[in-house]
């Protein structure tokens, strides 16, 4: 007998990248150097990522809707899977941006990767302790970007699987007769 698909379960399937065309990872790249911004943008696009680039930590906060003065984007509509930021920037450093992102309830779970041309161990340790996903030395290589992308894809898949399992448990609680029939394969 054919399995009955409940509307909530169908909704999950329709939004899954596993069953439709996969949504590219969206990366927010932050760097004050025009050359470095273009370089990282190119690496990310070659790795099949959607990329948004900004030239400062302040602009990144504006883009995310986390600035105090003016909210440019409502973060309920914004899906960013990864933030890559330079460490040394005028105004606000990448470390300060990292702290603000990790303080935000809307974006604290988004991985932040710090990039720098300076290999200063206390700086690297401080960023990692504050919650940075990784610290990359410039010039960033394509292999670095691919490793990050693959790691994020695994996390996204795990997150999606957990959401399906949660919805199935909710469905069992809401439709206990259906769950019993499903188990009995009637």
Curated annotation (Swiss-Prot):
Predominant localisation class: nucleus
Summary of the tissues where the protein is detected: Predominantly expressed in roots.
Superkingdom of the organism of origin: Eukaryota
Transmembrane segments: none
One GO cellular component, as annotated: nucleus
GO biological process, one term: cytokinin-activated signaling pathway
Induction: By cytokinins (BA and zeatin) and nitrate.
Keywords associated with the record: Cytokinin signaling pathway, Nucleus, Phosphoprotein, Transcription, Transcription regulation, Two-component regulatory system
Record bears the keyword Metal-binding: no
Residues of the Response regulatory domain: 26-153
InterPro entries, alphabetized: ARR-like, CheY-like_superfamily, Sig_transdc_resp-reg_receiver
Signal peptide: none
The keyword Transcription regulation belongs to this UniProt entry's keyword annotation: yes
Gene3D superfamilies: 3.40.50.2300
Residues modified as 4-aspartylphosphate: 86
Localization of this protein: Nucleus
GO molecular function terms noted in the UniProt entry: phosphorelay response regulator activity
Post-translational modification: Two-component system major event consists of a His-to-Asp phosphorelay between a sensor histidine kinase (HK) and a response regulator (RR). In plants, the His-to-Asp phosphorelay involves an additional intermediate named Histidine-containing phosphotransfer protein (HPt). This multistep phosphorelay consists of a His-Asp-His-Asp sequential transfer of a phosphate group between first a His and an Asp of the HK protein, followed by the transfer to a conserved His of the HPt protein and finally the transfer to an Asp in the receiver domain of the RR protein.
Functional description taken from the UniProt entry: Functions as a response regulator involved in His-to-Asp phosphorelay signal transduction system. Phosphorylation of the Asp residue in the receiver domain activates the ability of the protein to promote the transcription of target genes. Type-A response regulators seem to act as negative regulators of the cytokinin signaling.
Family: Belongs to the ARR family. Type-A subfamily.
Protein name: Two-component response regulator ARR6
Organism the protein comes from: Arabidopsis thaliana
